[in-house]
């Protein structure tokens, strides 16, 4: 999938999960009137879970073991509660910006083999209730799973970088700014900081 230009919700804010197992390329995209956005190269399936009193809760399960997300030099931006990038590998070569000013607003990059479960009941205006739950896979790799290229910049209230493949690493040649919250990096491989 190639995403270029504006993506807008006409009407109330909504959450979006966009999936393509063959890969996703974003270059010059702006997301407007979304609550949370997830881009993933995983395979989707729906799962209904019985709750108390006969209530059924639906989850979108995403199983990721292939594919790459690439953010091009014209970048990606949005005013979002959450931005989730989920792929076997992620490369950022331009500005990646979450403009929402809350300290809980985040960009989370999850690279490697993983399973994610999205709660479809999560409100697109609620930044306190979790939207997605992750479970790492069992894969091993010595590759660079997440690369932030020279001249690129990742900006959000919080930035979370998670590499699930054992031995896979992170290489940052750009700039990362967690402007209002915290910065988290989890990887068992090499972490190279050059920016």
Regions flagged by a language model, labelled:
Residues 1-195:
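Extracellular and secretory-pathway beta-repeat/beta-biased strand scaffolds
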């Amino acid at each position: 999938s190639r995403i270029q230009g504006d993506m807008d919700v006409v009407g109330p804010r909504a959450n979006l999960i966009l999936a393509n197992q063959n890969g996703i390329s974003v270059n010059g995209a702006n997301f407007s009137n979304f609550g949370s956005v997830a881009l993933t190269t995983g395979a989707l399936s729906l799962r209904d879970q019985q709750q108390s009193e006969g209530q059924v809760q639906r989850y979108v399960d995403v199983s990721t073991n292939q594919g790459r997300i690439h953010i091009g030099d014209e970048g990606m931006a949005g005013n979002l509660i959450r931005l989730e990038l989920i792929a076997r590998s992620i490369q950022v070569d331009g500005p990646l910006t979450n403009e929402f000013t809350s300290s809980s607003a985040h960009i989370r990059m999850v690279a490697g083999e993983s399973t994610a479960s999205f709660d479809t009941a999560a409100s697109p205006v609620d930044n306190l209730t979790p939207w997605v739950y992750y479970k790492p896979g069992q894969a091993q790799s010595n590759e660079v799973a997440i690369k932030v290229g020279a001249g690129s910049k990742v900006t959000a209230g919080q930035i979370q970088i998670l590499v699930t493949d054992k031995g896979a690493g992170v290489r940052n040649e750009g700039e990362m700014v967690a402007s209002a919250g915290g910065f988290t990096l989890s990887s068992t491989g090499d972490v190279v900081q050059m920016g």
